[in-house]
Amino acid sequence: MRLSTLFLAGSGSAVLAAPTPSLMGDLLSLTNDIITTVTSTIVNDLASQVAALGCVLQTNANQHGQILNTAALTIEAIEVAAKRFTQICNWSKPGKQYINWSTYKANGVNLGAWLEIEQNYDTEWWAANVGSFPDEWTWCSTVGFSVCGPILEKRYASFFTIADIDKMGAKGINTLRIPTTYAAWTQVPGSGLYSGNQQGYLRALTNYAIDRYNMHVIIGLHSLPGGVNTLGIGEAFGHDAWFQNSTNLDYSFKAIDSVLNFIKTSGRQNAFTIAPINEASDNFAGFATPAGLTDAGVNWINTYIKGVLARIAKVDKRIPLMLQDSFFSEMFWSPFYPAGTNLVIDSHIYFFAAAGAYSQYVPAAVCGQAKYIGQGDGKFPVFIGEFSLQTLYNNTLSNRKTLYDTQVYAYQKYASGGAFWNGKMLNNVDGVDGEGMLQDYWSWEALADAGVVSNTIDQSYC
C-alpha cells in the first residue's frame, strides 16, 4: 500500500417497510434454495476448471489464524526519549548459496515505478507522457501500443540503471524487490498493459546487481490478469476480475512459468525469490482492513499460491516464494501451509495513515510493534517488503534519520529485514503535513543524498 493506494470507503443503510412475517419467510426460503443451488453449481464448475489446470480449489478459509492488521497500527503519545542508539546490523551475504529467509537479513530497496508505472513517483514524466489517464491500461488502450510502447521502452532503459545499483551497493543494500506487471511475462488477449522488452532490462540490471554486489532479487507480480485489488497497480482502476476466474488463473500460471524460466536461464538461480501477488483485495471497500478479503478471496489466493509452489518445485524447491499478506500478517496465513514450506510472508508497514501517527511518536511505536509483526507465530519468516518515512502528522526533515535507522534496525532484529519503498520518487508537487515535500520521505536516493541513509545505524530509537 503506497500513498496512491489508500482510500477510505463508507457504507450506508436503507430503511425499508417491513413485510408480513409469512411473506418474508417464503421469500427467505425461496432465496436460500436458489442461492444454495446456484452457489453449489458455481463452486463445482470452478473446482472442475481449476482441476483442469492441475490445482485443487481451496475451501478452508475459515481455518485462518489470527489477524494482525499492519495497516491499522495505533500510535500513542509518549514522552519522547532524547537518547539515540548506534546499532550493528549483520546483513547477509548469500554468495552462491540459496538463501534461507529464516536466517537471511535483508537491507533492501524497492525498484518500483519502473517496470510498473505509478503517477505519484514521477509526476513530470507522467504529465508529459500519460497526461490525464489514470493508469497504464487506460493510457495504452486509448492511444495504442504503437504510441505508449516506445515511451515505456525509454523509461525502462532510464528510470533505474546500473548507476542506481552502484549507489545502493555503496550503502550496503543487499536486496532488491522489483515489481513488474504480468504483461512483462505473458501476453493476455485484450489486456491494456504493454508487453515489450521488460525482461531484457530486468536481466541486465539484475545480472549486474548479483555479480557486482551479491544482491538478492525478489521478482514481484504486482498485477495479475483481471486485476487483484481495483487499483492501478493491480492491473487497472476498477479491475478485480482475477478472483474466481479460471481463465485469469491460467494466465497467471503462464506468467509464473515465464518468471521461473527467467530465473532458470539466468545462470544465477540461487539469487531469486518469487513474489506472485501483491496487496490483493476482492472487497475494495475494506481494502487494507480485515474486510478487504472475503473467504472466497482467501480461498482463491491459496489455490493460486499452492499452484505456484507446485510449479516452483518442478524447477527447484530451494527458490523461495514470498506471499504478500494483504495486511493480515503471517499468523493469518500460517495454518494454510505445512511447516517446512519454502515460504516467506511479506508485510507492508506504513505510518502515513496510522491513527495518532505524529512523527515524534512513531520510532517508539516501531520498536514496540516490530516484534509482533516480524515474528508472527514463528512458523514462517516475515519480511517487511515496503516501508517509508512519511507519518500522518508533523513530518520533520530532522527526524527522518531516526525514522529510517529505527525501522531498518527493528525490522532486521525482529524480522528478516525490509525494503524501503521506493528507490526513487520524483514528485515536487505533493506536500505532507509538516516540513518538506512527499519525495523527501519516499525517495531512497534522495534520502541517501541528504545523508539520511548512511553506512551506519546511529540514530535508532531502540
What function would you assign to each model-found segment?
Residues 1-22:
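Fungal secretory targeting signals
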Residues 20-173:
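N-terminal carbohydrate-binding accessory modules
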Residues 106-115, 174-180, 216-219, 223, ...:
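Structural recognition of the beta-strand scaffold that forms the well-ordered cores
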Residues 154-176, 190-223, 234-273:
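An active-site-proximal structural segment forming one wall of the substrate-binding cleft
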Residues 85, 254, 261, 265-273, ...:
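Extracellular glycoside hydrolase catalytic/binding regions
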Residues 184-188, 225-235, 283-286:
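Short acidic/His/Gly/Ser-rich catalytic and metal-binding motifs that mark active-site loops
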Residues 107, 375-461:
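Substrate-binding cleft of secreted/luminal carbohydrate-active enzymes
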Residues 209-213, 315, 414:
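Helix C-cap/helix->beta junction micro-motif
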